[in-house]
C-alpha cells in the first residue's frame, strides 16, 4: 500500500483527512471514458460518469475513515487509484471497533441506494429517457455503479471489505489470529475463482485485480502465522495494552534502538527501576518513553500499560520519543 501512496499527489483535505490521487488514475480514466463515449452524444457525459464513480468511491472511503475515528482510532489519509480507494485507517485492535470501521464503507453505498433509485424513478416518470437521454443514461449508470461497488466490496474475499468483515465477526468467537487465518484461506479460494473468471472472460482487469488480492492474501497469511505464534507466548500479568487490552509477552521481545540489545521492556521498566514510566535498556541504560504493543502496533508508556492493567503507577506524563523496536 505504501507504493500506492508514493505515486499519489494531494488533492484536498477535509476533516483533517488528506485526499490524494494516484497518477495512474488518469490513464485508466482516459481509457474508460473512450469506451463509454459511444453511449453518449458528447464527451462531457462519460467524463461525468467517471467523476461520479470517483465521488462514490471517495464517499465510501470517508465512511471507513470517519467510523475509525469514532472508535478511537486514527485515520488521516485516503488515496484513490484505478482499483478503487484506500483509506489508511488504524482502528483499535478489537473486533467491535474493526467491524464498525469496515462496515461503515459499504453502509455509505447502502445509504445511496434509495437516493439513486428515487432519482432514476423520477427521471423515468418525467420522460427523461426521450427528452434528455444523456442525463437519464447517466442516472442509470451511476445507480448501477453504486450497486456493483456495494456487491463487489461485500464479497467475502480478503482483503475486500466483505472478507475483513468476515474476519471481524469470526474474531468474536475464535480470536484475532485464527479469524485472520480463516479469512485469508477463504480469500485464496476467492482468488482462484477470480482467476478462472478472468480466463473465461478474457479480462485483463479482473486478472490484475485477482493478482492484487493474491498478494494481500499472501501478506495476510504470513501475518496470521506470526499472530498464531505470538498467541502461544506466556504473558506478563499486571500490564495491558490500552488499545487491544492484550498483556505484553513475557521475555526479551524488544530491541534497543540505541545499542541493538534485546530486552524485556516491562522487566526493566517495572522491576529494576521501581516501576518507572519508561522502558530502560539494561545494556546501555537508554530510556524509551513509549513501548510498542507487539499485538496491535500502538505505542504507550509503561505507566499507560500499567494503568490499563489495573496497576497504579505514580509517574509524570512523558512525551513520545524514539521507542524500542520489536525483534523480528
Feature map (PLM): residue ranges:
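Hydrophobic transmembrane alpha-helices and their immediate loop junctions
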Residues: 1-328
Amino acid at each position: 500500500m505504501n507504493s500506492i501512496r508514493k505515486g499519489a499527489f494531494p488533492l484536498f483535505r477535509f476533516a483533517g483527512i488528506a485526499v490524494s490521487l494516484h497518477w495512474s488514475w488518469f490513464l485508466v480514466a482516459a481509457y474508460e471514458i473512450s469506451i463509454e463515449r459511444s453511449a453518449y452524444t458528447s464527451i462531457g457525459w462519460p467524463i461525468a460518469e467517471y467523476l461520479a464513480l470517483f465521488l462514490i468511491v471517495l464517499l465510501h472511503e470517508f465512511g471507513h475513515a470517519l467510523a475509525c475515528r469514532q472508535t478511537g482510532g486514527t485515520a488521516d489519509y485516503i488515496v484513490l487509484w484505478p482499483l478503487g480507494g484506500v483509506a489508511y485507517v488504524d482502528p483499535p485492535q478489537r473486533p467491535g471497533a474493526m467491524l464498525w470501521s469496515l462496515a461503515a464503507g459499504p453502509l455509505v453505498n447502502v445509504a445511496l441506494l434509495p437516493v439513486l433509485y428515487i432519482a432514476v424513478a423520477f427521471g423515468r416518470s418525467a420522460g427523461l429517457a426521450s427528452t434528455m437521454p444523456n442525463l437519464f443514461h447517466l442516472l442509470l449508470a451511476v445507480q448501477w455503479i453504486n450497486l456493483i461497488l456495494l456487491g463487489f466490496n461485500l464479497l467475502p474475499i480478503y482483503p475486500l471489505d466483505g472478507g475483513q468483515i468476515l474476519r471481524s465477526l469470526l474474531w468474536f468467537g475464535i480470536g484475532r489470529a485464527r479469524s485472520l487465518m480463516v479469512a485469508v484461506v477463504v480469500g485464496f479460494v476467492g482468488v482462484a475463482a477470480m482467476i478462472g473468471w478472468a480466463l473465461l472472460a478474457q479480462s485483463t482487469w479482473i486478472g490484475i485485480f485477482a493478482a492484487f488480492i493474491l498478494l494481500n492474501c499472501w501478506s495476510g497469511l504470513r501475518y496470521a502465522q506470526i499472530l498464531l505464534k505470538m498467541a502461544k507466548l506466556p504473558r506478563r500479568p499486571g500490564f495491558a495494552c490500552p488499545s487491544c487490552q492484550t498483556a505484553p509477552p513475557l521475555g526479551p521481545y524488544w530491541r534497543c534502538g540505541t545499542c541493538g540489545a534485546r530486552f524485556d521492556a516491562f522487566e526493566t521498566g517495572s522491576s529494576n527501576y521501581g516501576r518507572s514510566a519508561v522502558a530502560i535498556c539494561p545494556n546501555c541504560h537508554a530510556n524509551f518513553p513509549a513501548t510498542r504493543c507487539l499485538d496491535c502496533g500502538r505505542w504507550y508508556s509503561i505507566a499507560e500499560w500499567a494503568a490499563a492493567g489495573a496497576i497504579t503507577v505514580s509517574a509524570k506524563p512523558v512525551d513520545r520519543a524514539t521507542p524500542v523496536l520489536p525483534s523480528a
